[in-house]
From Swiss-Prot:
It holds the Pfam family FlgH. It comes from Campylobacter jejuni subsp. jejuni serotype O:23/36 (strain 81-176). The gene is flgH. The basal body constitutes a major portion of the flagellar organelle and consists of four rings (L,P,S, and M) mounted on a central rod. This is Flagellar L-ring protein. Its main location: membrane. NCBIfam families: PRK00249.1-3. HAMAP family: FlgH.
Length: 232
């Protein structure tokens, strides 16, 4: 019994390792961490001036300009995929070995054996064929639309912003989690302080649900283990 468990347990652990759900890391890209932040310009207002240059100047866009400012991201992501593959292979092999099965070196023996072979007519013949035909097709159409407010985490030395934000909703026992991070240009931010997700570089968008409905749609772990180790 111990020997059986010794051989079975590695496959079980292998099956469990293959059932890990895909994850996404919201950690900033390496170049964002390596680049130094942009130095802030501390501008002092001129005494008696009507038009200051502080955080709330009279003439300026109401857009994110500093660290911790908010930017609203309009997520409009759609993906369409269509794949089709066909494969066919065949192989035929024929081997035919005629003549007698008995041979001799000397003349007298060879003549005698040739007479025996003439009556026996022993030979070998093999035929083999192999044919494989396979086809596959896949079609997917996905879309995801929502809005989320993000925060300017870092202003890079070239003026671009690294933004990050998250949102959690709990509705009827179902928890919805949305997370987003990426790099944007301040020039792509609209006058209403919004930006489309298509303008985000190195975008990472995570959407997942937690609750009874999510658990009911998942395969039991036992089924996942069997599918992972089943060789056929």
């Amino acid at each position: 019994m111990k020997k059986v468990l010794f051989y079975v347990l590695p496959f079980a652990f292998f099956g469990c390792s293959a059932t890990v759900d895909p994850q996404i890391s919201m950690k900033p890209p390496a170049y964002v961490e390596e680049l130094a932040p942009k130095q802030s310009n501390n501008v002092e207002s001129a005494p008696g001036s009507l038009f200051g240059k502080g955080d709330n100047p009279l003439f300026s866009d109401k857009k994110a300009m500093n660290v911790n400012d908010l930017v609203t991201v309009v997520i409009q992501e759609s993906t369409t995929q269509s794949t089709q593959a066909n494969k066919a292979t065949s192989r035929t092999n024929t081997s035919n070995l005629g003549g007698g099965a008995l041979t001799g070196s000397s003349g007298v023996v060879a003549n005698a054996l040739n007479k025996v072979n003439a009556y026996s007519n022993i030979g070998f013949q093999t035929n083999s064929s192999n044919k494989y035909t396979g086809t596959g097709s896949q079609s997917r159409n996905e879309s995801f639309n929502t809005t989320i407010s993000t925060r300017v985490i870092k202003i890079l030395s070239n003026g671009n912003y690294f933004i990050e934000g998250s949102r959690e909703l709990l509705i009827n026992g179902e928890k919805q989690i949305i997370q987003l991070s990426g790099v944007i240009r301040p020039y792509d931010i609209g006058q209403d302080n919004t930006i489309d997700s298509k303008y985000i570089a190195d975008a990472k968008i995570l959407y997942k649900t937690e609750g009874e409905v999510d658990r009911s749609t998942r395969k039991p772990w036992g089924s996942k283990v069997i599918e992972a180790i089943w060789p056929f």
